């Protein structure tokens, strides 16, 4: 249909031909009846992408010959038949009946190892929980915690949530991904009023990984109004991210400014010694005995990733109990034997140059061979430069070593990395480079999520 094709041409100018071809032209036109356009996506992920990135543009730009807006309905290939009433009802009520975010009772302030590096965020969150528990206002709202993966942000947030709930404060604890999924579901089922009531009729909102909203205009718009509603009523907001507010890419300036209204607190990861002390305390709680060099080996094998280490120790305790070895001192050989599957998985997903190349290729929709090849097409040059930049940033590889990986001389590597750095310094949060680097950084920082599933 002409209106749809004109809309696609407009989007090519705004978001690029490659993106349109990948996400929009692959949508199948099922039917058009002057005021309604029915599209079929290949899967539910494409539907979600459409709702996040295109829905608001459709409302503004897709008009029929009579000047009336065209309503677009998108279903996925595996759900191309109309929804049954029961399916619609289930989608409508799924998040309204959800518990207000499960927390781990082990993640308390008492179980958090306080070090000079993280003393400030601990004191702030403790004071926040104490004041809020007593029904008093806290001088900083919102509290914005930022720091790398496994620095303790989740632990601190859950500790504060636990205290507030014990005091009867209605506290919602969610991830940004869950907020996004709830929003998409509400849009599709026509339940936006109930969605807004669910998120705004609380006394405190804790939301993790706010960088997940980067590049998602519709979700940012809704969160902006959610934030304003809560803040205006003096309700408490705590946010976490791997990025400081000013370092968020593809995030609306008005949101960033609001994140800075209260206090932004860096959360530093434990030092090697602090991590070891923390794990030793956990080992004692699990009633197992591990020889010091065996613990050092485990820390090294799991790259000091605290969440994976905690899961591994829990798994070890279960297997020790099963084999009735609770009173036996475990040496490195014992740990290797008891956690063989865990250690093999860790080795498989260890961050390497080839892993960065694969992740970059997947993000940009090209093959690793394209990135490592000789083509100078922009379709391949940009992913190649980003991959080089990430090898430098994440692995601290020398220019010569990166050149060996990509079969380039070191001067080419330097110019490629410099090109990406300059584009990032331009501070265009909506650029392909900024969005790509931020999303890949998040994915690579979360590389051990699959390991966590293995050792649960």
Swiss-Prot record:
Record's protein name: Chromosomal replication initiator protein DnaA 1
Comment field on protein domains: Domain I is involved in oligomerization and binding regulators, domain II is flexibile and of varying length in different bacteria, domain III forms the AAA+ region, while domain IV binds dsDNA.
* Underlying gene: dnaA1
Q: List the CDD domains.
A: AAA, Bac_DnaA_C
Report the superkingdom from the record: Bacteria
On whether Cytoplasm is a keyword of this UniProt record, the answer is yes
Where are the stretches annotated Domain I, interacts with DnaA modulators?
A: 1-68
Kindly give the SMART domains that the UniProt entry links to this protein: AAA, Bac_DnaA_C
Q: Which residues are noted in the entry as ATP-binding?
A: 150, 152-154
Sum up the protein's function in the record's words: Plays an essential role in the initiation and regulation of chromosomal replication. ATP-DnaA binds to the origin of replication (oriC) to initiate formation of the DNA replication initiation complex once per cell cycle. Binds the DnaA box (a 9 base pair repeat at the origin) and separates the double-stranded (ds)DNA. Forms a right-handed helical filament on oriC DNA; dsDNA binds to the exterior of the filament while single-stranded (ss)DNA is stabiized in the filament's interior.
Region Domain IV, binds dsDNA, residue ranges: 321-456
Q: What subcellular compartments does it reside in?
A: Cytoplasm
Please give one Gene Ontology molecular function term for this protein. lipid binding
**Signal sequence, renumbered to the chain:** none
InterPro entries, alphabetized: AAA+_ATPase, Chromosome_initiator_DnaA, Chromosome_initiator_DnaA-like, Chromosome_initiator_DnaA_CS, DnaA_C, DnaA_dom, DnaA_N_sf, P-loop_NTPase
Sorted alphabetically, the keyword list is:
ATP-binding, Cytoplasm, DNA replication, DNA-binding, Lipid-binding, Nucleotide-binding
Q: What is one Pfam family matched by this protein?
A: Bac_DnaA
What family is reported?
Answer: Belongs to the DnaA family.
Instruction: Give the quaternary structure.
Output: Oligomerizes as a right-handed, spiral filament on DNA at oriC.
Gene Ontology cellular-component annotations: cytoplasm; plasma membrane
Q: Which GO terms describe its biological process?
A: DNA replication initiation; regulation of DNA replication
Where is the region Domain III, AAA+ region? 102-320
Q: Where is this region: Domain II?
A: 68-101
């Amino acid at each position: 249909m002409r209106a749809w094709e004109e809309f696609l041409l407009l989007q090519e100018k705004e978001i690029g031909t490659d993106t349109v071809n990948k996400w929009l032209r692959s949508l199948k036109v099922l039917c058009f009846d002057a005021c309604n356009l029915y599209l079929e996506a290949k899967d539910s992920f494409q539907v979600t992408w459409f709702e996040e990135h295109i829905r608001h543009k459709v409302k503004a730009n897709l008009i029929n010959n009579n000047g009336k807006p065209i309503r677009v309905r998108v279903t996925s290939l595996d759900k191309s038949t109309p929804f049954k009433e029961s399916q619609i009802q289930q989608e409508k009520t799924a998040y309204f009946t959800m518990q207000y975010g499960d927390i781990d009772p082990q993640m308390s302030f008492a179980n958090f190892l306080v070090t000079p590096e993280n003393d400030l965020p601990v004191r702030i969150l403790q004071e926040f929980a104490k004041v809020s528990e007593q029904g008093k206002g806290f001088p900083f709202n919102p509290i914005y915690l930022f720091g790398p993966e496994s620095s303790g942000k989740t632990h601190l947030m859950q500790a504060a949530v636990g205290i507030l709930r014990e005091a009867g404060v209605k506290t919602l604890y969610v991830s940004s991904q869950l907020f996004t999924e709830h929003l998409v579901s509400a849009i599709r089922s026509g339940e936006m009023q109930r969605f807004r009531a669910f998120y705004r009729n609380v006394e405190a909102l804790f939301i993790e990984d706010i960088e997940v909203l980067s590049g998602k205009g519709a979700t940012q718009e809704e969160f902006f109004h959610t934030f304003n509603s809560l803040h205006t009523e003096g309700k408490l907001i705590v946010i976490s991210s791997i990025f400081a507010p000013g370092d968020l890419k593809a995030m609306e300036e008005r949101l960033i400014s609001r994140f800075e209204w209260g206090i932004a607190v860096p959360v530093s990861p434990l030092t090697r010694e602090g991590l070891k002390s923390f794990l030793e305390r956990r080992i004692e709680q699990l009633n197992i005995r591990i020889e010091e060099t065996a613990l050092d080996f485990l820390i090294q094998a799991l790259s000091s990733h605290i969440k994976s280490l905690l899961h591994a120790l829990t798994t070890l305790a279960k297997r020790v109990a099963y084999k009735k070895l609770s009173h036996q001192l475990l040496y490195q050989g014992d740990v290797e034997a008891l956690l063989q599957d865990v250690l093999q998985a860790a080795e498989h997903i260890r961050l390497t140059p080839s892993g960065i190349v694969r992740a970059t290729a997947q993000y940009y929709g090209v093959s690793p061979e394209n990135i490592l090849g000789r083509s100078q097409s922009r379709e391949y040059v940009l992913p190649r430069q980003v991959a080089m930049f990430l090898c430098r940033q994440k692995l601290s590889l020398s220019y010569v070593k990166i050149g060996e990986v990509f079969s380039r001389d070191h001067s080419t590597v330097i110019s490629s990395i410099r090109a990406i750095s300059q584009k990032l310094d331009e501070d265009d949060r909506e650029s392909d480079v900024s969005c790509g680097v931020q999303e890949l950084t998040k994915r690579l920082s979360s590389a051990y999520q699959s390991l966590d599933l293995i050792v649960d």
